[in-house]
Swiss-Prot record:
Keywords associated with the record: Acetylation, Isopeptide bond, Nucleus, Phosphoprotein, Ubl conjugation
Organism (species): Bos taurus
InterPro entries: Mak16, Ribosomal_eL28/Mak16
Protein name: Protein MAK16 homolog
Residue spans crossing the bilayer: none
Record lineage: Eukaryota, Metazoa, Chordata, Craniata, Vertebrata
Amino acid sequence: MQSDDVIWDTLGNKQFCSFKIRTKTQSFCRNEYSLTGLCNRSSCPLANSQYATIKEEKGQCYLYMKVIERAAFPRRLWERVRLHKNYEKALEQIDENLIYWPRFIRHKCKQRFTKITQYLIRIRKLTLKRQRKLVPLSKKVERREKRREEKALIAAQLDNAIEKELLERLKQDTYGDIYNFPIHAFDKALEQQEAESDSSDAEEKDDEEDEEDVGKREFVEDDEVDESDISDFEDMDKLDASSDEDQDDKSSSEEEEKTLDAKHKGKTPLKGPLRRKRAYVEIEYEQETEPAAKAKTT
């Protein structure tokens, strides 16, 4: 038969309890079924045959109850009741199940349930909220990265200074070619100079053309023409037409004569500005004949 006073005298005062933690001010209990976490007579789960507590498992709250009738059966010592997710309905369930329990246990169960629900709500909020992940770095790696950053910054500043200096020299025509350095910047500078020189040349040409046109005289036709002038022009056109017909007849007759001469003579001589006329030369041939007497003696 279980006696709560004997158990408390044994565990609480005289002998050792594995769940007890003593400090300078107070003693605490590490038992998982402890209602308050304090080591005292009313809160001890081992020295109270009628006891109740609240536990949380995987985000769900349960009410655990112990009575003296099941003290002889350790396998069925605790009765578990699942509480509702709604806070008010869960409190009603606690009141219904702990109606014959001491008021202290009932009040502490409600207090424990409120604390558990509060930290569950906080856990849900933290999981939904985006958090920073802190990654530990060794001091060696940190120093190495800092040195690399400083070296890269110094190298970038040097490159910019060298580029500016070389661009200024190129603009001042200090030297013609650039060696051992990226030439992209110089190509850009040369393109800008060429574009500026082309625009200045075009402007100078336009100015010269405008100066040349100054004082130039031109003749422009008049739109108003008298009728007498028109009749004179018509007579001139008739005369020009008759003269053109005569010239066409003459040219056709000359072409026919040329074709006949070409047939008789053969090939036509070459025409061109480089051809020279040959001088007229008369050639005479003389034949000598020996006398007949000389021929007989021989």
